[in-house]
Amino acid sequence: MVMEKPSPLLVGREFVRQYYTLLNQAPDMLHRFYGKNSSYVHGGLDSNGKPADAVYGQKEIHRKVMSQNFTNCHTKIRHVDAHATLNDGVVVQVMGLLSNNNQALRRFMQTFVLAPEGSVANKFYVHNDIFRYQDEVFGGFVTEPQEESEEEVEEPEERQQTPEVVPDDSGTFYDQAVVSNDMEEHLEEPVAEPEPDPEPEPEQEPVSEIQEEKPEPVLEETVPEDAQKSSSPAPADIAQTVQEDLRTFSWASVTSKNLPPSGAVPVTGIPPHVVKVPASQPRPESKPESQIPPQRPQRDQRVREQRINIPPQRGPRPIREAGEQGDIEPRRMVRHPDSHQLFIGNLPHEVDKSELKDFFQSYGNVVELRINSGGKLPNFGFVVFDDSEPVQKVLSNRPIMFRGEVRLNVEEKKTRAAREGDRRDNRLRGPGGPRGGLGGGMRGPPRGGMVQKPGFGVGRGLAPRQ
């Protein structure tokens, strides 16, 4: 029976899932995805302030990866593209966010070129790997808070725990046959069914081991589940077809034999499996811990300076600021009556202005929209309508659900006098709330309750590697 080659997209998705799992659990094994002629570029600048040069070969790539100090990395994959390229290779482009050592998530883009390994059909290694952080290219510090994105990041990571890394020094390769779509719903790109591009199954282990694992057709457990998650029916059909034809090469069958009952994947003695795909290096998203700390304080310092300088600016030049562009202060919209404006809080950190504007356009004509993404998280913003009627319509329809799942904090825009009055009241009340009224016993619990955020931080990631 002739095996049908998986589509490039299925290969790309499976590779991305396996690669980023390894980045989280055993970054010291990443070099096995590469070969002696592989090149690796991981953003950043050298000591002279120039873009860092690429490194070549497994040894240098391993040294470079270890210099990044990847610890407890978390990755949120937003989009994966994959196309067939020369000599039966596959080009994979990944866009998402990466957090290193529980720092804020940073947007990144990574491109892999997967080349056939040659010794076995449907085996690939990473020939080229280019990684860049978005803030390094466009400036600014584009981040998302680790707490908010934790839920999305955690779920894929739990799925990714199943892949086991093969400790072969010969190089880690990716098995195309085992194409299970364990990525988040974000990865719902349509799969081009016609493309029969060879997408190797990343079986890093010796051929003998692969043959031993062939008997168990476990693909059905992983692929159908993933196919359902993919919004486009085409990927689901392809995934099912590949599963039926390639059951003997199922990555799941390999891992099911070696994984402990709990499903935890050992970091060091990783059982042989086809997970070692040389294509994805989301780890790069998380810059070395040594680099991140200096940047965050600078950003926090800038934010503090802005907050300190803003109050005096509001009074003297409200009209000038109304025309300025920026995401920090709402005073730019002073030229519009307060009755035409709405304050919007709890905005998703990746929200786009055009998307938000289209959402509120259903209530009335939006003449201006601003999002504050440079201060404390989560983001907030202001929407300005050409009339007060849309404002009242929005307020009467509260709660406002954005994307059907995010509840926005929508309030009337307060005048400066009202805001200052609220601040004075808060200062007089203090952190414990108004004195008198409620008994002392009532003040303690609320404060304690506000400290802990159930759902965030719980299971934030795997335990740090020993």
Curated annotation (Swiss-Prot):
CDD domains named in the record: NTF2, RRM_G3BP1
Protein's GO biological process: defense response to virus; innate immune response; negative regulation of canonical Wnt signaling pathway; positive regulation of type I interferon production; stress granule assembly
GO CC, one annotated term: cytosol
EC numbers on record: 3.6.4.12, 3.6.4.13
Modified residues (Omega-N-methylarginine): 435, 447, 460, 465
Catalytic activity: ATP + H2O = ADP + phosphate + H(+)
Region of interest (RG-rich region), residue spans: 410-466
Compositional bias of kind Acidic residues: 145-157, 185-206
Keyword RNA-binding recorded: yes
Cofactor(s) the protein needs: Mg(2+)
UniProt superkingdom: Eukaryota
Chain positions of cross-link Glycyl lysine isopeptide (Lys-Gly) (interchain with G-Cter in ubiquitin): 36, 50, 59, 64, 76, 123, 353, 357, 376, 393
Residues recorded with modification Phosphothreonine: 143
Position of the Glycyl lysine isopeptide (Lys-Gly) (interchain with G-Cter in SUMO2) cross-link: 376
Record-listed N6-acetyllysine modification sites: 376
Subcellular location: Cytoplasm, Cytosol; Perikaryon; Cytoplasm, Stress granule; Nucleus
InterPro entries: G3BP1_RRM (IPR034374), NTF2-like_dom_sf (IPR032710), NTF2_dom (IPR002075), Nuclear_transport_factor_2_euk (IPR018222), Nucleotide-bd_a/b_plait_sf (IPR012677), Ras_GTPase_bind_prot (IPR039539), RBD_domain_sf (IPR035979), RRM_dom (IPR000504)
Cofactor: binding comment: Mg(2+) is required for helicase activity.
SUBUNIT field: Homodimer and oligomer. Component of a TAU mRNP complex, at least composed of IGF2BP1, ELAVL4 and G3BP1. Binds to the SH3 domain of Ras GTPase-activating protein (RASA1) in proliferating cells. No interaction in quiescent cells. Interacts (via NTF2 domain) with USP10; inhibiting stress granule formation by lowering G3BP1 valence. Interacts (via NTF2 domain) with CAPRIN1; promoting stress granule formation by lowering the saturation-concentration of G3BP1. Interacts (via NTF2 domain) with UBAP2L; promoting stress granule formation. Associates (via RG-rich region) with 40S ribosome subunits.
Protein name: Ras GTPase-activating protein-binding protein 1
Protein source organism: Pongo abelii
Name of the gene this protein is made from: G3BP1
